[in-house]
Regions:
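Single conserved hydrophobic/aromatic residue that forms the stacking wall/gate
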Residues: 112-121
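Hydrophobic faces of well-ordered beta-strands that scaffold small-molecule active sites
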Residues: 4-6, 25-27, 53-57, 104
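Active-site beta-loop-alpha junctions enriched in small/polar residues
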Residues: 7-11, 30-32, 58-62, 107
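Glycine/small-residue-rich loop that forms an oxyanion/phosphate-binding "nest" at active or ligand-binding sites
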Residues: 63-94
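A short alpha/beta connector and helix-capping loop motif
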Residues: 12-36
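Short, well-ordered coil/turn segments that N-cap beta-strands
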Residues: 2, 23, 49-51, 96-100
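Acidic (Asp/Glu)-rich catalytic clusters
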Residues: 17-20, 42-52
Length: 121
C-alpha cells in the first residue's frame, strides 16, 4: 500500500477536507505553526478518519515559517524539538493514540544532513 502523507495544522484550516484523502499526517507542533488548539483539532480529525498521527517539529521560527536555519544552541534546539514532540504526544495520548512518526519541517529537515547534532535529537 502507498502511504499518502500530508503536513497539516499549519494555519490553513483545511484538515477536515484533506484527512479523508490521506493515510498519515504530520501535525505542526508549535515551532513554525500550530498550537495546542490546532493540535487537538488535527488529532480529533485524524482519529475520525483513521489517519496515522505524526509530529512535524521545526525550528522555533514563526516569522520565517521554520524555513530558515536560525542561530540556536544545540541545547535550545534539543529542548525546543523535544517540547514540540512531547506536546503533540501528550495530546495524542489523551485520546488513547500514539505518535506513528516524526517528520522534520523546513530548515530542520535539510540541515540535518550537515549538522549531526540535529540528527541526534
Amino acid at each position: 500500500m502507498i502511504n499518502i502523507n500530508c503536513d497539516l495544522g499549519e494555519g490553513l484550516n483545511n484538515e477536515h477536507i484533506i484527512m479523508p484523502l490521506i493515510n498519515s499526517c504530520n501535525i505542526a507542533c508549535g515551532g513554525h505553526a500550530g498550537n495546542n488548539e490546532s493540535m487537538i483539532q488535527c488529532v480529533e480529525i485524524a482519529i475520525r478518519n483513521n489517519v496515522q498521527i505524526g509530529a512535524h517539529p521545526s525550528y522555533p521560527d514563526r516569522l520565517n515559517f521554520g524555513r530558515k536555519k536560525i542561530k540556536i544552541s544545540s541545547s535550545e534546539f534539543s529542548h525546543s524539538i523535544m517540547d514540540q514532540i512531547n506536546s503533540l504526544e501528550q495530546i495524542a495520548s489523551s485520546y488513547g493514540k500514539e505518535l506513528n512518526h516524526i517528520k522534520a519541517h523546513g530548515a530542520v529537515s535539510y540541515t540535518h544532513l550537515t549538522l549531526p547534532t540535529i540528527c541526534s535529537v
